[in-house]
Every structure is written in structure tokens, then in C-alpha cells.
């Protein structure tokens, strides 16, 4: 196809691409606005050995994974639910449901454990992440009381968390819908052009398809 053919297609069928893209973008925007917003709050906890000893520091790094396993349990979630109820913020969910809304990960190079809590209310997500970390601090202090001071592992809580919207990402979804719609519209246009590629409408079509020069054209009859 020549460049002029592409311009002809855009001129005659470009509206299809635009319409499909707009419809897809509007649909994605509407679907995003209809979703219940979910907020995420992240809390960081730093785990520090009591003495600057290479052996204890290495052990602490290994313990980080164990701490994550201990915190990522239904029993731990129940403790957080109890704390929420005591603070006047009871949750209508089971420990399993709360546990599924919390992701705990360790970063051994920084001696940090990160707690990500998701909830339909931003402030509640903050409280869950904060209390989850506080429970860990309390448990770690109790464990420290069982060992010598030089063998203790201290816990330092980060700043009180601040929530952010986790989903829906309305802007991203709308843009993705528009791009998908434009691609779909382009496929529709390509299909229409392929279907009609065998039709001959003008002398130029004859020359392009058959490679023959048109010597004359039979005029249409008028009645």
C-alpha cells in the first residue's frame, strides 16, 4: 500500500478508531468509578541486634524470615482484631480475612520488615498496619526479657503510616481502555479493508490490482 492509501483509510474510516477508543475509555472510567476503593498503608519495622557483632547481625538477618512467618498467622491477626476492638474500632471480619488483607515482607539488606495493610477505609488501614507492628514490638520485648542483654534483638517502629489509594487506578484504567479501544478500532478498520480489498471502484483500483493501464472508462448511463 502507498502512503496515499493510508491517508485515504484514515480519512474514510478513522472515525471508527476514534469512536471505539472513546467508548472503551468511557467504559473503563465508569467501571473504575463503580468499584469500591481500597486503600493501602505501609509500616516499616527495623530489627537491630543489641551489640554490633557480625555473628549476631548475621543471625538477625536469618531471623527476619522467621519473624515474618510468626507475624503472618491467624493468631496474630486475632490479636490485632482484639486491639482494634479495645480501641473502639471493631472489625466485622474473621482473623483469616484480616490476614489475607495484610502482606508482610522482609528486607534483609536493611534489617527491615514491611507490613502492608489494605482496607476499604484509609484510616483503618493505617491502624491495622500500626497495631500489627506494635504487637511485634511487644512480643519482641517479652522475648528479650528471656535472654541476656547482649543477646537481645531490639525493634524500632517507623513513623505512623500514611495510606494511599491501592485500587482502582482510574486514570491508568481509563488510559489503558482508550489504548485498547484504539487498537481494536484499528483491527476493525483493517478487517473492513481486507474484506473490501477485492472490490474495484476506481480505475486506480484496476491498475493497482491487475498492473494494467486503464485505456478508457465506460460512463454510467443516465435514465
Question: Which residues fall in each region the model found?
Answer:
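Hydrophobic and amphipathic membrane-targeting/association helices
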Residues: 1-223
Amino acid at each position: 500500500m502507498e502512503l496515499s492509501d493510508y491517508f485515504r483509510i484514515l480519512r474514510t474510516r478513522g472515525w471508527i478508531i476514534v469512536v471505539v477508543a472513546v467508548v472503551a475509555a468511557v467504559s473503563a472510567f465508569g467501571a473504575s468509578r463503580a468499584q469500591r476503593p481500597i486503600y493501602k498503608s505501609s509500616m516499616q519495622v527495623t530489627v537491630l541486634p543489641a551489640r554490633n557483632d557480625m555473628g549476631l547481625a548475621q543471625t538477625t538477618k536469618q531471623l527476619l524470615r522467621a519473624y515474618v512467618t510468626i507475624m503472618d498467622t491467624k493468631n496474630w491477626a486475632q490479636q490485632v482484631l482484639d486491639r482494634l476492638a479495645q480501641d473502639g474500632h471493631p472489625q466485622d471480619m474473621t482473623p483469616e480475612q484480616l490476614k489475607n488483607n495484610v502482606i508482610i515482607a522482609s528486607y534483609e539488606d536493611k534489617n527491615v520488615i514491611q507490613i502492608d495493610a489494605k482496607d476499604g477505609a484509609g484510616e483503618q488501614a493505617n491502624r491495622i498496619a500500626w497495631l500489627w507492628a506494635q504487637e511485634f514490638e511487644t512480643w519482641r520485648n517479652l522475648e528479650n526479657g528471656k535472654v541476656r542483654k547482649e543477646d537481645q534483638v531490639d525493634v524500632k517502629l517507623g513513623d505512623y503510616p500514611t495510606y494511599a489509594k491501592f485500587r482502582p487506578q482510574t486514570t491508568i484504567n481509563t488510559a489503558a481502555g482508550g489504548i485498547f479501544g484504539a487498537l481494536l478500532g484499528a483491527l476493525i478498520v483493517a478487517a473492513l479493508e481486507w474484506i473490501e480489498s477485492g472490490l474495484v471502484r476506481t480505475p486506480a483500483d484496476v491498475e493497482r490490482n491487475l498492473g494494467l493501464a486503464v485505456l478508457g472508462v465506460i460512463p454510467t448511463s443516465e435514465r
